């Protein structure tokens, strides 16, 4: 009973921070939501965000989480530009989405800069625990990302990838 009351309260707290939120959203005691000035977070219908999930943006960033998507415990969605997670996605625990190199760096003779590119996860994607999805990546519809994979390049639709850096393990996969 206490868990139910706490979940309703934390869902209410999370909804207050969001730009838009669909029907049947549930937030089970997420860690925190920090939105930079001018940023937006849009969450679709029937989304469940588990415990200790962190959503954080820089200024004028966008995060979209599609209908019927699940974000597991300890997942981090960090956006400086845009992170778009499609419909019907299953995101396991402790997954990291990061659309930036985070700190400025320079290769000898070049200007110091931070690399920023949007992340797009298409519909019906399954991402295993402790996977990392880095800047500029598009994960194709129906794909599966293995546990602990570090995704640095686009993943074609219906493809299983794993490893560090992630590589194709199997093509033409399906999952329920």
Where are these regions (language model features)?
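Glycine-rich NAD(P)-binding loop of Rossmann-like domains
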Residues: 110-124
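Short acidic, glycine/proline-rich loop/turn micro-motifs
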Residues: 107-110, 173
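A generic "structured core" feature
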Residues: 144-146, 150
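Conserved SAM-binding loop
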Residues: 101-107, 138
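Conserved coupling/switch loop of ABC ATPases
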Residues: 135, 153
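Domain-scale signature associated with acetyltransferase and cell-envelope carbohydrate enzymes
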Residues: 1-98, 122-124, 131-133, 141, ...
